[in-house]
């Protein structure tokens, strides 16, 4: 499997995970669970909260102790676990907590996947400025494909986007990417200088 194809698959999955619920979650929360507009908005605010510090924290860990592709897999596993837990919740408090924790571990994976891609292209002696954009566009394709899937596919005569099944779809994709990260992505070592300084 060529390096560019591996990175295309990684980007496709990375953003398909997000596309499975980002656009449709509001329909489930408002329609299926009858949450208020303020409550629904708070779920989307979790991404901003997580982005304040989690990417930087995971970046430090990847730089010093754990290879980026391994940390990517670990974060995806944890995020998937919280998505599964979220799918079984119907009360605002527990569901919000599960989604917040899931997003806490998902948001850093965006930067981690970029780091893995740039490192892999560098190891393959490919110009990242030239080769990364066509790879990254497959992330957008993955997002749209997942969004269409939950919009169009029905379970028991009900669109997935109106049910908790969208969270299971996202969790399954997250698990697949975790396994893929552990088995198919090139090794990205922590910085020897940073590890020594720590």
Predicted regions and their residues:
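Single conserved hydrophobic/aromatic residue that forms the stacking wall/gate
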Residues: 187-198
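Helix-to-loop junctions at the C-terminal end of transmembrane segments
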Residues: 54-66, 154
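Symmetry-related core transmembrane helices of the 12-TM Major Facilitator Superfamily/SLC fold
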Residues: 166-181
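Structural signature of the two symmetry-related core transmembrane helices
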Residues: 70-83
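Residue-level signature of mid-helix packing/kink "hotspots" within the transmembrane helices
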Residues: 48-52, 56, 144
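Helix-loop boundary and gating motifs at the non-cytosolic
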Residues: 2-48
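Hydrophobic core of transmembrane alpha-helices in multi-pass small-molecule transporters
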Residues: 12, 93-109
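Cytoplasmic helix-loop-helix junction between adjacent transmembrane helices
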Residues: 106-135
């Amino acid at each position: 499997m060529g390096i560019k194809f591996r990175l295309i698959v990684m980007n496709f999955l990375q953003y398909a995970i997000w596309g499975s619920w980002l656009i449709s979650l509001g329909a489930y929360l408002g329609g299926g669970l009858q949450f208020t507009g303020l409550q629904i908005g708070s779920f989307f605010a979790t991404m901003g909260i997580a982005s304040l510090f989690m990417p930087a924290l995971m970046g430090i860990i990847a730089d010093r102790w754990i290879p980026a592709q391994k940390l990517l897999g670990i974060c995806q596993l944890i995020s998937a676990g919280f998505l599964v837990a979220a799918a079984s919740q119907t009360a605002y408090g527990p569901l919000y907590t599960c989604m917040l924790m899931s997003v806490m571990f998902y948001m850093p994976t965006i930067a981690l996947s970029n780091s893995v891609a740039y490192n892999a292209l560098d190891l393959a002696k490919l110009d990242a400025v030239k080769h990364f954009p066509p790879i990254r566009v497959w992330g957008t394709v993955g997002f749209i494909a997942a969004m269409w899937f939950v919009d169009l596919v029905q379970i028991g005569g009900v669109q997935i986007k109106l049910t908790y099944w969208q969270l299971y779809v996202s969790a399954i994709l997250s698990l697949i990417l975790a396994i893929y990260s552990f088995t198919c992505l090139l090794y990205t070592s922590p910085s020897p200088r940073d590890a020594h300084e720590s």
